[in-house]
Amino acid sequence: MTHRFAIIGAGAAGSFTARRLRQHFPDAEIVVFEREQQVGGRAATVTFCGEQVEVGGTLLHSSNRRIVELAAELGLEYSPPGVALGDMDASVTVWDGQRFVFRASTKGMAFLFSLVRRYGLFNLRRLRAAAGETIAKWNSIYDKQDAGVVFESVGDVVEALELGVETKVSLREFARSRKISERVVDEIGAGILRNMYNQTPDISSLAGMVGLAGAGFAGGSLFSIERGNAAVFAGALERADAEVRLGETVVGVSNTLELTTETGATEAFDAVVLAAPVELAGVALPATPTTTDEGYQRVHVTLVAGLVNGSYFGVPEAPGTIFTTPSAPFKSFGRVGFSESEQLPIYKFFSETELGDGFLSQVFGSILDVHRLSWLAYPKMAVNPSLHSFNLAPGVYTTNVQEAICSTLETEAVAGWSVADLVARDFGGRAAAAS
């Protein structure tokens, strides 16, 4: 019997669901619906001043096994090539809205010495150990998946990986229990989490430690894909031999697994995977949907082509990357590219609210162009999160409920893998039958 599977969403979760489903069902028909005109989900790019600029999901980590393995399979190049924290020739700072409380070159030992001087060697060791232990627990999911373990719910994932404690306390509380100083939490922790999630160290310890590890504080190296991180997800869909329908919005799924699109067209499938947040997808489902009870966090991105007025920051020249404490008017700021056509650097802000022209005129001495975007990017990853089932209704599955515990491109890819395995168990896929 040839199965027909529908996937709603062509981001990390949707593309890896498709890729894994193809491994289970060599002859299945896999159709991916994506309401945008590009694949990649939050790893989105825009054309700005003649350059392709990534506006979200910009960094990957060497421990991201699913993405790293597929990138290697696809022959994708890294940019920059696998740098470790302390190897990048740039500068990074923490700004409190008035002054830089931390500032250092990220090149070589100078960065490490600056960290030790500000935060203390033993604090940094304890941070690295705590982040490393958490990531080691999370990374055990790969061997479990490869061994044929099927997860029916996010609760199953948390229990199998022994991450219950990390989901029940905040990063701040967890750090305190590990004797990591408040300064580390309020400057390093807050700076990175404000940049990554637009949130604070009061998020769950699991989400916080995943964020810190993703910034290099558990070892490993950071990188991006030369052609943009979305190239991995486009490659996953190609390897899945999926039919990808861009610009096609699904508005409903019936009890009989019939999909309805925005144009009124209908189509029947054997199973449907919603690879997008239930509460944001705008899809009427055959059962009361489970949602991320804590809601989603809005992120504003502002791209600016221009010349920075260093005096705004009290320095002759703005650093390459600026993280911030809660008293600052934006979450993070940094140079992300260079417009060859305009011969101007391109900068990116993350902020909680829209940054107006008046504010930008203070930061920049001259501005050629501005591009603003806003979206509900991440769930609010609170302590004691909802641990919902991946199965919404008979034949209807969802990947994004896992975002309640942590949310990165890799964890979404892992969720897609888990859901594909669940579908395979329910529909007798080849790998499921062999296990």
Question: What is the predicted function of each stretch?
Answer:
Residues 13, 38, 279:
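Conserved Rossmann-like nucleotide-cofactor binding loop
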Residues 72, 80-198:
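Mobile amphipathic helical/loop "lid" adjacent to a hydrophobic cofactor/ligand pocket
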Residues 209-257:
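Helical element adjacent to the flavin cofactor pocket in flavoenzyme catalytic cores
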Residues 332-435:
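Conserved flavin/dinucleotide-binding core of flavoenzymes
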